[in-house]
């Protein structure tokens, strides 16, 4: 939520299927999003990307109309028949911009993971919670590189587990 409506909701499934130390780690991760105002950061990026998308479409769509004139019979963006061409230009711009939003989201999630580890000081619990989430999830633990770069909004679960385990090792030795 925004403003006074900001809340973390704890589901009965979480309470029933996760031990308290893992719930604490999960809530610390979610609290990080509030502490860092991640929703506002993501909204600002999306607005900026919306303007960038509109700019790209304004440049690409006229070129596409000219290029496709022979096949479509569309001479101008003022022709209602150009709507599918504008739609295609919008889709292409979205594909081009998708990795930017995904990379930003992954960076925010990594930051929230680090916050959870620093607040709870319990990488064991966080790694265990992530393993439990992975076991219940249908997400691919080894997504292809292209999927990770273009579409993934979270780092791969195994990378996150490794980070939590590294936190344990680092703090056990230092």
Regions found by a protein language model. Name each.
Residues 1-77, 91, 95-174:
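Polar-ligand-bearing catalytic/cofactor-coordination segments
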Residues 80-91:
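Short, contiguous hydrophobic alpha-helices characteristic of membrane insertion segments
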């Amino acid at each position: 939520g925004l403003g006074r409506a900001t809340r973390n909701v704890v589901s009965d499934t979480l309470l029933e299927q996760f031990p308290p130390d893992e719930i604490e780690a999960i809530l610390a991760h979610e609290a990080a999003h509030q502490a860092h105002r991640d929703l506002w950061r993501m909204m600002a990026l999306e607005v900026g990307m919306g303007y960038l998308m509109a700019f790209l479409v304004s440049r690409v769509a006229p070129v596409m109309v000219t290029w496709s004139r022979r096949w479509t019979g569309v001479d101008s963006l003022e022709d209602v028949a150009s709507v599918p061409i504008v739609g295609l230009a919008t889709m292409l711009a979205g594909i081009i911009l998708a990795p930017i939003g995904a990379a930003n989201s992954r960076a925010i999630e990594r930051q929230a993971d680090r916050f959870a580890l620093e607040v709870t000081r319990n990488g064991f619990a966080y790694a265990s919670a992530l393993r439990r989430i992975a076991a219940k999830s249908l997400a691919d633990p080894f997504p292809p590189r292209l999927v990770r770069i273009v579409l993934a909004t979270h780092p791969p679960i195994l990378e996150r587990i490794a980070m939590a385990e590294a936190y344990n090792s680092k703090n056990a030795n230092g």
